[in-house]
Amino acid sequence: MAADVDKTPAGEQKDDHEDRGTPSSRRGRSRFTQISSLFIIAAIPVIGVCIKYYLDIQFVKRHEAGLKALGADGLFFFSSLDTDHDLYLSPEEFKPIAEKLTGVAPPPEYEEEIPHDPNGETLTLHAKMQPLLLESMTKSKDGFLGVSHSSLSGLRSWKRPAISSSTFYASQFKVFLPPSGKSAVGDTWWIIPSELNIFTGYLPNNRFHPPTPRGKEVLIHSLLSMFHPRPFVKSRFAPQGAVACIRATSDFYYDIVFRIHAEFQLNDVPDFPFWFTPGQFAGHIILSKDASHVRDFHIYVPNDKTLNVDMEWLYGASETSNMEVDIGYLPQMELGAEGPSTPSVIYDEQGNMIDSRGEGGEPIQFVFEEIVWSEELRREEASRRLEVTMYPFKKVPYLPFSEAFSRASAEKKLVHSILLWGALDDQSCUGSGRTLRETVLESSPVLALLNQSFISSWSLVKELEDLQGDVKNVELSEKARLHLEKYTFPVQMMVVLPNGTVVHHINANNFLDQTSMKPEDEGPGLSFSAGFEDPSTSTYIRFLQEGLEKAKPYLES
């Protein structure tokens, strides 16, 4: 009986051993909970690795199955449509093939398109084009030996604009207006920002159809589609996109110059892709500050250089090992406004329509007031600002060949000369030239040394070959000969005396091989003592300094 008596004093809470347990048991449960939690946390990355391993195995199996079913070329074409690289084609990815087979294309679905007033002003643009001169291509010299006819099929058949005339709403050109905080003459901004740099690399070549344009890309895509149905608003190589600069301003209008880097893919399946990359699209627009009226619009590919288009095409299923490259001359590619934008209807003070442009009728006649600019820049200066925005290496002036030597002689400086196939300051530039301008040539230490001790210049090989044969200008002809004597493909950097003597030179490929970082290289990748310089920057500075040293005996004599 005594065992059944509860001897707990009155007012005290009774311990429930079954529910609460001893302190040691509570500690045991706590340890178990902690260990379980740690185990779960540790297991998560293991599970993730296992899942990734499983997915990778499945992807490899699908790739092998695709290769077995389609062959290398077939899988290449499949991959060009498979934009998310999952080895499955969604209806959206299959759409280009459906359009090709049926001949029917659904209306384009552009994202983020700005709504337009159906009664607003409209602008009519006309496209003009002269096809690329095939004889200007390097491979034409041997009759395109080794180049299959199918590779150039898209280029040979492209003789005229895809759309000769098209009408746009004036409000669509709102994309060219400056953003907030950019309203002063000389201000520059990105209309379409570049998403590539030396670290991101470039976009793939094995694509046939451009992605759906978004936002401000929509108008640019529509404009370029007047030339060819497959424009890529974002080019494969940096700098991509479009930049703009306010050239002039008045109370109600802006005059804006702009520069666009875009390209076209010319071939259809079953031929492999052919990329046609103009050096740039330059242009200007005069529009009201509310984008309700466009006074003038013009966009064109500059044709003032002997070569202005880069071309690259695949002739096999491997993206890198089966690539051909050439450069050529495009005489004309431009869009121009028929006249200022005009309203399709006019209303009197009572809101009654008093005149209308009927279908097939004569256009309404308007008289436009003269625009008086309150502030403006020379067009050349505005274009230079665009150039520096896209290419920081142009913070140093690069003068034409003849002008560079005249300036060097007057200032008693050396000429820092770069000789290459494509223009250094546009998209017709070759691969090693692109690497140079995106790395060493834009680095602050190199810019400072070039500004202090050199006159800089770049030249096309073709231009110096022509200059070498100019019997009317013996002095410049000799300078061109001395340059070409030291030139090796594709890019040669030189330190040259004002009289044309080359005192130091290096090939771009050799330079890049010397400065590329390899896993087996010893030592730090950056020189902290030199202000965080990378190896290529310090090597280029050493190249320039060696040139200065070698030139001393000539300059002091």
From Swiss-Prot:
Domain of life assignment: Eukaryota
Spans through the membrane: 35-55
Biased composition (Basic and acidic residues): 1-21
GO biological process: calcium ion homeostasis; calcium-mediated signaling; muscle cell development; muscle tissue development; regulation of ryanodine-sensitive calcium-release channel activity; skeletal muscle fiber development
GO molecular function: oxidoreductase activity
Knocked-out gene: effects: Emrbyos show disruption of muscle architecture and greatly reduced motility. Embryonic muscle tissue display disorganization of the sarcomere and myofiber attachment defects. Embryos show a defect in the generation and development of slow muscle fibers and a decrease in the expression of myogenic lineage genes in slow muscle cell precursors.
Subcellular location: Endoplasmic reticulum membrane
One cellular component (GO) term of this entry: endoplasmic reticulum membrane
Glycosylation sites: N451, N499
Principal location listed in the UniProt entry: endoplasmic reticulum
Oligomeric form and interacting partners: Interacts with ryr3.
Protein name: Selenoprotein N
Taxonomic lineage from the root: Eukaryota, Metazoa, Chordata, Craniata, Vertebrata
Gene: selenon
